[in-house]
């Protein structure tokens, strides 16, 4: 059997001067002027503002309409399925009364909790 180290090229020797002064191809590359970066003009003009990736949402999702052409999944009957039924215990008033610490609460800032004794 022959020695495999003789058959395999020595890459350490082949690339010893790679990316150095002795590498002519690399030195030619360094002499080139830098390329300008790609510029994408008007990348947000179609959607505008905070509407990215919406595009033609209604037109693209026509297959999701039900029989009555409402938006949603096919045969979407969620709006009339629970009509007239209450969702659990409906004894609570719709609007909660103002908390008694409202005047003290405002002095602590918008999203801060009042001290422990106020609630």
From Swiss-Prot:
<comment type="function">
    <text>Regulatory subunit of the mRNA-capping methyltransferase RNMT:RAMAC complex that methylates the N7 position of the added guanosine to the 5'-cap structure of mRNAs. Promotes the recruitment of the methyl donor, S-adenosyl-L-methionine, to RNMT. Regulates RNMT expression by a post-transcriptional stabilizing mechanism. Binds RNA.</text>
</comment>
<dbReference type="GO" id="GO:0106005">
    <property type="term" value="P:RNA 5'-cap (guanine-N7)-methylation"/>
</dbReference>
<protein>
    <recommendedName>
        <fullName>RNA guanine-N7 methyltransferase activating subunit</fullName>
    </recommendedName>
</protein>
<feature type="region of interest" description="RNA-binding">
    <location>
        <begin position="56"/>
        <end position="119"/>
    </location>
</feature>
<dbReference type="Pfam" id="PF15320">
    <property type="entry name" value="RAM"/>
</dbReference>
<keyword id="KW-0694">RNA-binding</keyword>
<keyword id="KW-0539">Nucleus</keyword>
<comment type="subunit">
    <text>Interacts with RNMT; this interaction enhances mRNA binding and cap methyltransferase activity.</text>
</comment>
<dbReference type="GO" id="GO:0031533">
    <property type="term" value="C:mRNA capping enzyme complex"/>
</dbReference>
<dbReference type="GO" id="GO:0003723">
    <property type="term" value="F:RNA binding"/>
</dbReference>
<keyword id="KW-0506">mRNA capping</keyword>
<feature type="modified residue" description="Omega-N-methylarginine">
    <location>
        <position position="85"/>
    </location>
</feature>
<feature type="compositionally biased region" description="Low complexity">
    <location>
        <begin position="89"/>
        <end position="112"/>
    </location>
</feature>
<dbReference type="GO" id="GO:0006370">
    <property type="term" value="P:7-methylguanosine mRNA capping"/>
</dbReference>
<feature type="short sequence motif" description="RNMT-activating domain">
    <location>
        <begin position="36"/>
        <end position="42"/>
    </location>
</feature>
<keyword id="KW-0597">Phosphoprotein</keyword>
<dbReference type="InterPro" id="IPR028271">
    <property type="entry name" value="RAMAC"/>
</dbReference>
<dbReference type="GO" id="GO:0005634">
    <property type="term" value="C:nucleus"/>
</dbReference>
<feature type="modified residue" description="Phosphoserine">
    <location>
        <position position="86"/>
    </location>
</feature>
<feature type="compositionally biased region" description="Polar residues">
    <location>
        <begin position="47"/>
        <end position="61"/>
    </location>
</feature>
<feature type="region of interest" description="Disordered">
    <location>
        <begin position="30"/>
        <end position="119"/>
    </location>
</feature>
<dbReference type="GO" id="GO:0160130">
    <property type="term" value="C:mRNA cap methyltransferase RNMT:RAMAC complex"/>
</dbReference>
<feature type="modified residue" description="Phosphoserine">
    <location>
        <position position="36"/>
    </location>
</feature>
<dbReference type="GO" id="GO:0008047">
    <property type="term" value="F:enzyme activator activity"/>
</dbReference>
<keyword id="KW-0488">Methylation</keyword>
<feature type="compositionally biased region" description="Basic and acidic residues">
    <location>
        <begin position="62"/>
        <end position="73"/>
    </location>
</feature>
<keyword id="KW-0507">mRNA processing</keyword>
<feature type="region of interest" description="Interaction with RNMT">
    <location>
        <begin position="1"/>
        <end position="55"/>
    </location>
</feature>
<comment type="similarity">
    <text>Belongs to the RAM family.</text>
</comment>
């Amino acid at each position: 059997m022959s020695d495999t180290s003789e058959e395999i090229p020595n890459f350490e020797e082949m690339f010893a001067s790679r990316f150095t002064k002795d590498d002519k191809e690399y030195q030619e590359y360094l002499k080139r002027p830098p390329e300008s970066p790609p510029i994408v003009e008007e990348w947000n003009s179609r959607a505008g503002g905070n509407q990215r990736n919406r595009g033609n949402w209604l037109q693209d999702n026509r297959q999701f309409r039900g029989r009555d052409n409402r938006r949603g999944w096919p045969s979407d009957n969620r709006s009339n399925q629970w009509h007239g039924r209450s969702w659990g215990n409906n004894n609570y008033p719709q609007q909660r009364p103002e908390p008694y610490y409202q005047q003290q609460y405002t002095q602590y800032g918008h999203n801060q909790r009042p001290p422990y004794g106020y609630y």
